[in-house]
């Protein structure tokens, strides 16, 4: 199944985070924070402005992004994988290599 977001929505696959602290302590799943980074897997057509024009999204498929800890509260399971659906404005930054 393929997910096609509408308007300024973005679909993100959350990155796997290390469950070990800097001191080498392994964190149980309940104590580990959810990662706030991910990869964009689908992008909507853009935001509709007040004058009716559509502003294209600033992110594209494949971008590595950082988002806030409470962003992407909409989780969708697609082919057994949890994906986040959020507005483009919930993305804080694009990670450039």
UniProtKB/Swiss-Prot annotation:
Q: Name one Pfam family in it.
A: Cpn10
Mostly located where? cytoplasm
Q: Which domain of life is it from?
A: Bacteria
On whether Chaperone is a keyword of this UniProt record, the answer is: yes
One cellular component term from this protein's GO annotations in UniProt: cytoplasm
CDD domains for this protein: cpn10
Mind telling me which SMART domains this protein's record contains?
Cpn10
The record's Gene Ontology biological-process terms are: chaperone cofactor-dependent protein refolding
Output the InterPro entries linked to this UniProt entry.
Chaperonin_GroES (IPR020818), Chaperonin_GroES_sf (IPR037124), Chaprnonin_Cpn10_CS (IPR018369), GroES-like_sf (IPR011032)
Q: Subcellular location, in the record's words?
A: Cytoplasm
Instruction: Report a single Gene Ontology molecular function.
Output: protein folding chaperone
> Which keywords does UniProt give here?
Chaperone, Cytoplasm
Q: How does it assemble?
A: Heptamer of 7 subunits arranged in a ring. Interacts with the chaperonin GroEL.
Q: What does this protein do?
A: Together with the chaperonin GroEL, plays an essential role in assisting protein folding. The GroEL-GroES system forms a nano-cage that allows encapsulation of the non-native substrate proteins and provides a physical environment optimized to promote and accelerate protein folding. GroES binds to the apical surface of the GroEL ring, thereby capping the opening of the GroEL channel.
> Which family, according to the similarity comment?
Belongs to the GroES chaperonin family.
Q: Which NCBIfam families match?
A: PRK00364.1-2, PRK00364.2-2, PRK00364.2-4
Question: What's this protein's name?
Answer: Co-chaperonin GroES
Species this chain originates from: Stutzerimonas stutzeri (strain A1501)
| Encoding gene per record | groES
């Amino acid at each position: 199944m393929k997910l096609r977001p509408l308007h300024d929505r973005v679909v993100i696959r959350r990155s796997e985070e290390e469950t070990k602290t800097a001191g080498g302590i392994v964190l149980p799943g309940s104590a580990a924070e959810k990662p706030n980074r991910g990869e964009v897997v689908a992008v909507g057509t853009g935001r509709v402005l007040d004058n009716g024009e559509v502003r294209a999204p600033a992110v594209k498929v494949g971008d590595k992004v950082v988002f806030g800890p409470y962003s992407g509260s909409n989780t969708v399971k697609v082919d057994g994988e949890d994906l986040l659906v959020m507005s483009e404005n919930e993305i804080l930054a694009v990670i450039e290599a």
